[in-house]
């Protein structure tokens, strides 16, 4: 057998292995999309309870302004924590480029120094190539069960960084991710999580407590408010991660279907 024939057979075998990998990833993507979408829906009740608690704290703060926390205005030198969700694996088309470019476009327009935490090797590389300060990187969770530990670690790391800030600094927190969108599979989204939006606070405070007996908020609401804000951040990051994973798998499935059509 000539060397060229042997090389050709190796290439054919390699192509067969690649097709098998693509088929496997296609099947996994199809089964995972529903899991991630259902996990977002499952957050709704908990999100509602946290929102009701926040609304009660905001109402008390309005009734007792001296107990409300001091507001600090963000300055040009204040840091920004940006969490960007991408992917570790390929075969997702422009998925990582889309969200990386969105973050790269938005962050320079914000008043502050951006410090980035990237979820996914591929989006991390894209952000570093753009010159952004990537302080941390995380592996993309492979299941719904792995999302909560990831979010908890992100909260620990970003909170540790916030603790290093000066007492007069206000660290903003932004999250960037792709979210499902019917017409084009997904679209890039960005949200400021901290500081809390004043209009949003007013809207929560305007929602009446559902029971006849209103809860008592202890410690002028400071301790309770801090705990509820941490839960609000957890919910927001969990939702962003789950939506990103649903979008990633939808993109991978579309890529696989396009590949199958091209081979037909």
Predicted regions and their residues:
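C-terminal beta-strand-loop-alpha-helix "lid" module of Rossmann-like NAD(P)-dependent dehydrogenases
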Residues: 1-264
């Amino acid at each position: 057998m000539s060397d060229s024939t042997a090389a050709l057979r190796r290439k054919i075998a390699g192509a067969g292995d690649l097709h098998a990998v693509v088929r496997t990833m296609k099947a996994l993507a199809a089964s995972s999309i529903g899991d991630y979408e259902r996990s977002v829906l499952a957050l709704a009740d908990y999100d509602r309870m946290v929102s009701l608690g926040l609304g009660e704290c905001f109402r008390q703060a309005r009734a007792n302004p001296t107990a409300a926390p001091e507001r600090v205005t963000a300055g040009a030198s204040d840091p920004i924590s940006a969490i960007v969700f991408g992917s570790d694996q390929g075969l997702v088309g422009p998925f990582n480029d889309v969200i990386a470019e969105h973050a790269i476009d938005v962050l320079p327009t914000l008043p502050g120094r951006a410090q980035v935490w990237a979820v996914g090797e591929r989006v991390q590389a894209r952000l570093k190539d753009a010159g952004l300060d990537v302080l941390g990187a995380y592996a993309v969770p492979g299941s719904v069960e792995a999302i909560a530990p990831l979010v908890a670690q992100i909260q620990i790391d970003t909170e540790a960084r916030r603790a290093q800030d000066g007492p007069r600094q206000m660290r903003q927190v932004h999250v960037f991710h792709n979210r499902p969108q019917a017409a084009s599979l997904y679209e890039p989204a960005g949200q400021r999580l901290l500081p809390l939006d004043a209009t949003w606070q007013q809207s929560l405070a305007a929602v009446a407590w559902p029971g006849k007996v209103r809860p008592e908020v202890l410690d002028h609401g400071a301790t309770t408010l801090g705990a509820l804000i941490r839960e609000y951040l957890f919910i927001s990051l969990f939702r962003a991660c789950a939506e990103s994973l649903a979008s990633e798998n939808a993109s991978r499935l579309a890529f696989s279907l396009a590949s199958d059509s091209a081979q037909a």
